[in-house]
Structures are given as structure tokens and as C-alpha cells.
């Protein structure tokens, strides 16, 4: 109740506060210490500022270092200083720290060592678990510490009932209930008053308990004390003990049994004063089998089946709440008693102290009456939801009385369905306890993001919990309109705004009502709405990009974990026979598997969020496209209002700028304004609306547009944009346009190729809003001005006939994907590269960007030009040799080298003139090497002498260094042609002299020397008539060849 219990009250007083919850007792070894218990309603899992207050007077049961597994992320283990005090486990950063990191109330937790199913690979690990709540994992440094902690925490978590107290009908806390402090909102920590202070009177406390849910504070069982029995039960809590006032008619809880005599209401050691009866396990409806007035001193004993039924009832209510929050239909039938009290009674137990402050404005759905998804309906088309009627019936059947406030229903002033109703929250709702609600929603969000492995996860469509959604029906985040009163004066004041929103939400209704169809040309732009819509689109694009980045990061982490697990499996196969190594590998594998599971959960959630954001982005994008099409429709009407046309044109450019920027920032998405802007350049043409054209305006409506045009309206161009209509407006009034029907297949075949060519030519030239140069329309087959009365502003904006309409606009389903600006520029650069010779052979594109209005034949596909680096040099050499005047054929270097090698192997087949060999070699022209010729001047005597000296010096060096290398070449032929040693020495000197002469001549003149062919057969070359047995028989060809290749 709301009255503050005394901090230290005499042990002789009685307490007649309703007792609906479990109690605890002091161990027998401490009879002199007043019994205390932990607060049931701590908040946010007791983290930091929301943690429970530690009673400084309570003795410390156990303290020490433990490793605690983190609650989020990769589940890392943090070393913390744990202190077990008064059945509550507090932990700090170290033993000297005073600020509490967190608190865990251990009452009715189950503390035990970890099992293999827990997938915990750390040694000396134990857990404290509670069904339906997060399981805490701790790790000690030794097995002894582990056992000591398990025993101490188990003692603190055990509910002890002395035999003498078992006859008292107390509601026993069920072991499967949620005691965790993370799931409850914060409360003001009340200071304990002195023991002699008087609390508030009982009726006032009862009234307040009716209002805010703090009406049933739990009493505790105490061990029997002799002094308690001797005290006369005259007063309770300092007030005369008398009959309690009966429960009010509107109270959700009947009057319950009182605390037996001898029990006292204890002070809360950790500052929590209030206890809610609305938790599913708190048994808000206990049996009233005792006396109804006076002092409640004795009660019939509760039988064991009563306790079992009590536990079962608590568990059923808990399961119903879990199923309700997760969208799972409950297993009970419609006759279950839980259907006959208001759904606000099943408000989750986290909000017990505050449940009655919100008098049933926002209700959860009763089991089985949860409506279908509302994201597909506009807000003004929804009928009365069936769950609202069910709520009313449940409330009146249960006798909710004045505590239940009916919803208010309002008829919106809409132009659509007049029977649509919109739900509006009650104005009398009191927006209080926002800080508690924030903490509660954050704790709920953490709980929903970390479901236990055996439970069903929350539906992704339910979104996250926020302050406005705690007591409101669960909605899909993709719902475009919230269940709020519509802004009728804003949405429906402008007929054009009604047309846009109506056609986007429900395309089945005709977009142009009869009332406004003739007045569309008076459409005045609302810049604020356009700015708001474009801002939402940009914001949603940023959200999509961030979520996509997160998904990519999680995928990379998942792949790395999977690769690490694969390596671990391979190591287990390789080193499985070793004694200690497999155990470490198994621990490593278990840890990696746990991390992989967590990463997969996060990846699934991130992928679902990305999908929802993408759908929302596409909705916004289609709305912007529809707005763009509306503006283009308005611009193409035959209105004479120049100011309005300029304003509409500015709005079109604003939309195009945003869409172009989004497409450039995120090219992977198809965020292109091609579906609602004109093709670049002269290809942005639109068909005529004349009766002669088979492609009427209705047939050319883009399927991406939410409009389906009605008769009498103008053609809706699917690609407006990039051509300024005002410049075309004046021109089109002067020039009548030709309207040619698309009757022949030849004309249809011209469309796609012409679009590609024109788009390529204009891609890098035109920007958004820049009008390309215009040309005169064709003069043949002129039409009368009366035939183009309705087309003077919306017709052929570039002077082109309807047969040149892009294929992507005529047949939207068959058009190929439009190239981006970067791809078009890259393609233009590739076309401009290449050699000039191949450009002359290819098709010559006109340099002028001005289009030719007359029909031209379709272009052939231009082959990509090769760059200079890709041209084969052999082809150039062949072309140069073919174009050489005189028809002389020259050897390539490869042919010449092959010929010289052949001569080296078979020198006896050639008849070589020795005089030619000793003379100065002739100079030849090598055109492919581009060597300039010099006049052949004979050497002076001084130069000849100098040359002879050099030859002598080099000759001795070469003879010493290369004789032993050349001797073994032709040893097999020495028997056939025997020669004397003198002739061999002369021949050797000649070869050395010729070789040295060729080398010095090449180095001195700086150009290449070669022997010119005398006949078409292989030309004469220095070759020895001597047999190969000559040690230097092949020296001269090698020298000539080396001097040749050295200069290449």
C-alpha cells in the first residue's frame, strides 16, 4: 500500500495488510535479526542507477570475485566483485567501489552447475535461472569457490516455510515466476521513517492503492518468536485494529485475507515500498475462507492441492501473457475464466505499480481477437476494430465500473467512405510516470531481443517497444498511418492532395472524383508537403543504408566464425588422438558455436529490419513518383497561368534533384527518375492524344504510377522531366506538330535502337532541367491546327513524331534497364579511344548534338574500338611491308635469326665467297626499325691502323676465353675432312678478325650492320668452308648474330 511502513517497528505489533505474495524468513541461526526480504520490483535488471538499494545494516553472507557473462553482444565474461546480502546479489567493479553495477534478487531462483545443453565452455561455471527470464551465468576461479557460491546462492534463493507457519494460507511464490529485476519500472526510493512515526490511515491508503496499483503490499512470514505471542493484538502499525473497509465496487481485486496475528509488516531493506497484486503469480484472488471482520487471528489450513492449483493458475496467467506479447494464440478455449475479466488485468507484471494509473485507455488484444495486419489499410478506411467491442463486453461482464473508460469514436470528415471510424484515445488519460515507462520499455526491448532458446521469438513485424506502445495495440512498423485522429482539415482541405493520398493508398478508387475533375488546372502547390515528403524519403534512404551496412558487417562476422569453426573441426580430426588437445578444441568449438548463434540471431533481426525499411522506402518513393506525375499532368494542361507553370516546374526540378542525388549515392538500388522523367535529349517524346494514334493516353500510362486515367483526362507521361516545358510551350503554339500513328512494324523496330543512340549522344551533355537545342518539325503531312488544340503544351516537346517514342515508355515491361550516368560516360570514352584507322572504317557519328527530325534507318551496333595498347605490332609491320613501294620483301627479325641458326647448324650446304667475307659489309635498309642512312665513306689510313690495333688486342682475348668452349661442337665430323694445324690457325684468325671488326664498326657508327642478300635465297653470310672440327668454325656467325641482336 502507499503508506510507508516503519523502518524499525516493534516486533510486538500485528499487521492486517492483505497478503497475496510469497514470503521469506530469517535462517534459524540468526533469531535476533529482524527478517527482511528483497524488493520484488527492481527495475531494468537492477543495472546501475536502477539497481536495488543495499541495506547497510544487513550482514554480508558471502563476497568474492566471479566472472559474469555479459547480457549483450558476443557474451564476453566480465570480472566483477559480488556481494551476497539479504538474499540479493550485488556486483561492483572491484571491492573498493561503492557504486553498484547491478543487483540480482535471488529469491526462488534455481542455482546449479551448467549443463551441456547450456553451451558454456568455460570451466567452473554455474548458473542462476528462472523460467521465462534471462539466465545468469557465473564462473568461479576454482571448483571450491564454485561449490561455495552455489551453496550460498541456493540458500538465499530457497523459500523456507517453518512447520509452525504452514497452516497460514499464504500465497506461495511459484518457482516459474519472473522475479527478475530487469523487467520492472523504476520507483522512487522512499526513505524509511523512524519507528515512532505514524503512517497514513488505512482507508486513504486503500483508496490510493485503487488508483495506482500499489494496494496490496506483501507481508512476510516470520519465525515464531515468544515475545510476539505475548503481545496483545490491540494495534497494527500504530492504528487501532478494526475491520478493513470493503473493496470498492470498481476495484479489480476482491478483498483478500489479512496477515495472521504475530506477523509484522517489515520495512523494505532496499527502498522498494510498493507491491503489485497484478502480477500473474501474485494470486490477486485468494480464497476468502476466513472471518470477514475483526482481527484475523486464525484461518483454516490450506491443503496441498490448493497450493498446486495456485501455482498452476500463476503459471497459466504467465503463459497467457507471454503468448499475448508474442502473438501466439493461447491454448485455452473461449470458456476460460481469463476471458471474463478485462484485458488490462493481464497487463504485464513489470508495470504492476502503475497499471491502475492508466484506466484502460490502451488495451491489449484479448486472446483470439487480435485483428489482421493494418498496414494495408489507410487510416480513414478502417472500420471499428472487433477487439474494441470485445474489450467493452469483457469490462462490463466483469463489472469494471467507473474505473473503465470507454473509447471515443469519431466520424472523420472525409471524401472517401463516410462510414469509416477512427479510434481516438481518451482525453482524460493521465500522462504520468514517463520515466518509469521509459525504463519499462527499455527493459521490455532487451527482453524481446534476447529470447530464450526454447521459446518462440517475437514476430519481427511487431517492432520495438516505445513509450506510446506500452499500452496500445501492437502494430506493424510498416503501417503508414497510426491509429490517431486524422488531420481532416490538412488532408482533405485540398482536392489535389486528397487525390494523391487517396490514389496511393487505394488505387481501386478512381483518382479523379467528379467534383474535382474539371478543376484540376487550379491546383496550387503545397511546398511544405513536398518538402516533408522529400525529407522523409532522404531520411528513410539513410536508414536503409545504415541497416544495409550493419547487415554486411554481421554477414562478414558470421563468415569468419564459420571459417574458424571449420578449422576447429579439421583440427579435431587431425589431433583427436592426443590426450589433452581435443578438450581445448572442444571448448573452443563450443565458444565459437555460441557466438555464431548470437550473430545469426542479430543478422536475422537486422535483415528483417532492413526489409521493412526497404518496403517503407519504396512506398515513399512511389509516393514521390505519384506527386511528380501529378505535377507533370498539371504542367501539361492548356493553362495560361505563367506563374503557376513556373512554380510547378520548380517543384518538378526539386523532386528530380533529390531523386538523382539518391540514385548517385546508392547506385545499387533502382532509385532512378527514369520512370517519371523524360529520356535524356530528344528521345523524351510523348504520343499524341489524337484519335488517329492507336497508343492513346490511357494505354501509355506507366504501370508504376498509381493512377489509372479516366476518359477525358490528358495523357499521363511516364517520363516528364529534363525538358523545360515553358520554352516548349511558346514554340509549340507556333509550330503544328505531326502526329504519325505507329502502324507499321518498321516504325516500332526503330524505337529501341534510336533510343540507345540518342541517349548515348546526350548522356554527358544534358543535365536535369537543361533543354537541348530544338529543330523545326517536318513539314510534310502537316496537320491542321484544330487537330492539336489540346496538344499545344503537352504534346511533342522536341518536335519529334510519336514514332520516335522510347521503347521503355511504350512498352514498359520490355524495356531494358537504363544505363547510369557513369556507365554512359565510360562508354563514350571507350568509343572515343582507338586508332584513327579503325575509326575511319567504323560508322561516323554526327558531331552536332542537334537531332535530325526526319526518320533515319536504324544504326548498326558499333564494334568497340581497340586502344593503342591492344593493337598487335605484327599487323602494323605486315601493313607497312605490304605498302612499301617496289615490292621488296624484307625479313623479319625472327626469320633472320632462324636463318642464321640454320646456317650455323649446316654450314657445308652453302658456297661462301671468302673475299666477300673479308670485305667491308654492305649497308642495308631496315625500314621497320626507322634507321636513317648515312653516306658510305671509306676509312682513312689512320683509322685503318687504329682499327687493326684494336683487332689484334681483342683477337688474343677472344682466342684465350672462347677456344675451349667451341672445341666440342663438331668432334664427330673431324674424321671425314682432315686438315693440317696451320690452315686451322689461319682460319681461326680470320674468324676473330671479322667478328671484332663487326663489333667495333657497330659501336663506332651507332647503327646496325647486316649482310645484304645477293639472291632470293639466304644471303651470303660469314660461314666457314672448313669442317666443324675447326674449333672456331662457328665463331663468325655467332659474332654477326650477336652484333645484330645487340642493336635491336
Swiss-Prot record:
<feature type="compositionally biased region" description="Basic and acidic residues">
    <location>
        <begin position="201"/>
        <end position="233"/>
    </location>
</feature>
<dbReference type="InterPro" id="IPR040392">
    <property type="entry name" value="PKHA4-7_PH"/>
</dbReference>
<feature type="modified residue" description="Phosphoserine">
    <location>
        <position position="461"/>
    </location>
</feature>
<feature type="modified residue" description="Phosphoserine">
    <location>
        <position position="247"/>
    </location>
</feature>
<feature type="modified residue" description="Phosphoserine">
    <location>
        <position position="854"/>
    </location>
</feature>
<feature type="compositionally biased region" description="Polar residues">
    <location>
        <begin position="456"/>
        <end position="465"/>
    </location>
</feature>
<feature type="modified residue" description="Phosphoserine">
    <location>
        <position position="867"/>
    </location>
</feature>
<keyword id="KW-0597">Phosphoprotein</keyword>
<feature type="modified residue" description="Phosphoserine">
    <location>
        <position position="314"/>
    </location>
</feature>
<feature type="compositionally biased region" description="Polar residues">
    <location>
        <begin position="794"/>
        <end position="803"/>
    </location>
</feature>
<feature type="modified residue" description="Phosphothreonine">
    <location>
        <position position="1020"/>
    </location>
</feature>
<feature type="domain" description="PH">
    <location>
        <begin position="59"/>
        <end position="158"/>
    </location>
</feature>
<feature type="region of interest" description="Disordered">
    <location>
        <begin position="793"/>
        <end position="858"/>
    </location>
</feature>
<feature type="modified residue" description="Phosphothreonine">
    <location>
        <position position="1015"/>
    </location>
</feature>
<feature type="compositionally biased region" description="Polar residues">
    <location>
        <begin position="1"/>
        <end position="22"/>
    </location>
</feature>
<feature type="region of interest" description="Disordered">
    <location>
        <begin position="968"/>
        <end position="989"/>
    </location>
</feature>
<dbReference type="Pfam" id="PF00169">
    <property type="entry name" value="PH"/>
</dbReference>
<feature type="modified residue" description="Phosphotyrosine">
    <location>
        <position position="492"/>
    </location>
</feature>
<dbReference type="InterPro" id="IPR001849">
    <property type="entry name" value="PH_domain"/>
</dbReference>
<protein>
    <recommendedName>
        <fullName>Pleckstrin homology domain-containing family A member 6</fullName>
    </recommendedName>
</protein>
<feature type="modified residue" description="Phosphoserine">
    <location>
        <position position="848"/>
    </location>
</feature>
<feature type="compositionally biased region" description="Low complexity">
    <location>
        <begin position="687"/>
        <end position="711"/>
    </location>
</feature>
<feature type="modified residue" description="Phosphothreonine">
    <location>
        <position position="744"/>
    </location>
</feature>
<feature type="modified residue" description="Phosphoserine">
    <location>
        <position position="801"/>
    </location>
</feature>
<feature type="compositionally biased region" description="Pro residues">
    <location>
        <begin position="1016"/>
        <end position="1030"/>
    </location>
</feature>
<feature type="modified residue" description="Phosphoserine">
    <location>
        <position position="1021"/>
    </location>
</feature>
<feature type="modified residue" description="Phosphoserine">
    <location>
        <position position="251"/>
    </location>
</feature>
<feature type="modified residue" description="Phosphothreonine">
    <location>
        <position position="784"/>
    </location>
</feature>
<feature type="compositionally biased region" description="Polar residues">
    <location>
        <begin position="267"/>
        <end position="290"/>
    </location>
</feature>
<feature type="modified residue" description="Phosphoserine">
    <location>
        <position position="459"/>
    </location>
</feature>
<feature type="modified residue" description="Phosphothreonine">
    <location>
        <position position="920"/>
    </location>
</feature>
<feature type="compositionally biased region" description="Polar residues">
    <location>
        <begin position="712"/>
        <end position="721"/>
    </location>
</feature>
<feature type="compositionally biased region" description="Basic residues">
    <location>
        <begin position="828"/>
        <end position="842"/>
    </location>
</feature>
<feature type="modified residue" description="Phosphoserine">
    <location>
        <position position="777"/>
    </location>
</feature>
<feature type="region of interest" description="Disordered">
    <location>
        <begin position="165"/>
        <end position="318"/>
    </location>
</feature>
<feature type="modified residue" description="Phosphoserine">
    <location>
        <position position="1017"/>
    </location>
</feature>
<feature type="region of interest" description="Disordered">
    <location>
        <begin position="1"/>
        <end position="36"/>
    </location>
</feature>
<feature type="modified residue" description="Phosphoserine">
    <location>
        <position position="940"/>
    </location>
</feature>
<dbReference type="InterPro" id="IPR011993">
    <property type="entry name" value="PH-like_dom_sf"/>
</dbReference>
<feature type="modified residue" description="Phosphoserine">
    <location>
        <position position="1024"/>
    </location>
</feature>
<feature type="region of interest" description="Disordered">
    <location>
        <begin position="663"/>
        <end position="746"/>
    </location>
</feature>
<feature type="modified residue" description="Phosphoserine">
    <location>
        <position position="472"/>
    </location>
</feature>
